[in-house]
UniProtKB/Swiss-Prot annotation:
<comment type="function">
    <text>The SecYEG-SecDF-YajC-YidC holo-translocon (HTL) protein secretase/insertase is a supercomplex required for protein secretion, insertion of proteins into membranes, and assembly of membrane protein complexes. While the SecYEG complex is essential for assembly of a number of proteins and complexes, the SecDF-YajC-YidC subcomplex facilitates these functions.</text>
</comment>
<keyword id="KW-0813">Transport</keyword>
<keyword id="KW-1133">Transmembrane helix</keyword>
<keyword id="KW-0653">Protein transport</keyword>
<feature type="transmembrane region" description="Helical">
    <location>
        <begin position="1"/>
        <end position="21"/>
    </location>
</feature>
<protein>
    <recommendedName>
        <fullName>Sec translocon accessory complex subunit YajC</fullName>
    </recommendedName>
</protein>
<keyword id="KW-0811">Translocation</keyword>
<feature type="compositionally biased region" description="Basic and acidic residues">
    <location>
        <begin position="106"/>
        <end position="115"/>
    </location>
</feature>
<dbReference type="GO" id="GO:0005886">
    <property type="term" value="C:plasma membrane"/>
</dbReference>
<keyword id="KW-1003">Cell membrane</keyword>
<comment type="subunit">
    <text>Part of the SecDF-YidC-YajC translocase complex. The SecDF-YidC-YajC translocase forms a supercomplex with SecYEG, called the holo-translocon (HTL).</text>
</comment>
<feature type="compositionally biased region" description="Acidic residues">
    <location>
        <begin position="96"/>
        <end position="105"/>
    </location>
</feature>
<keyword id="KW-0812">Transmembrane</keyword>
<feature type="region of interest" description="Disordered">
    <location>
        <begin position="96"/>
        <end position="115"/>
    </location>
</feature>
<dbReference type="GO" id="GO:0015031">
    <property type="term" value="P:protein transport"/>
</dbReference>
<keyword id="KW-0472">Membrane</keyword>
<comment type="similarity">
    <text>Belongs to the YajC family.</text>
</comment>
């Protein structure tokens, strides 16, 4: 009986971990389902492989993505990771500007030894 009493807290802790892990997984799955249900043609998305594309058409389980002007490919809906928001485009432009500034500063600090 004593061994059972010592083992009971361990079981409760493990049960709690399992409950919270499954709850988090369920929430993530529901968020993915909600995203896939809310997609509309014309929106920009990221795929799970990192590709950025524009939605052209949506079917039950598939989605047509334009990856370059005039280039349309068909993907499973499950391959869509997230929607690209207009703020993301602004952030990318800001990062490019910052990279140029860093390159300019790095170029000014170069020291050459011309003897």
């Amino acid at each position: 009986m004593e061994s059972f009493v010592l083992f009971l807290p361990f079981l409760l802790i493990m049960g709690g971990f399992m409950y919270f892990a499954s709850r988090r997984q369920r929430r993530a799955m529901q968020a993915t389902i909600d995203l896939h249900d809310s997609l509309q043609p014309g929106e920009r998305v990221h795929t799970t492989s990192g590709l950025e594309a524009t939605i052209v058409a949506i079917a039950d389980d598939t989605i047509d993505l334009e990856i370059a002007p005039g280039v349309v490919t068909t993907w499973m809906k499950l391959a869509i990771r997230d929607r690209i928001l207009p703020d993301d485009d602004i952030d990318e432009e800001l990062n490019e500007d910052l990279d140029k500034d860093v390159d300019d500063v790095a170029g000014e600090r170069r020291v050459t030894n011309d003897s």
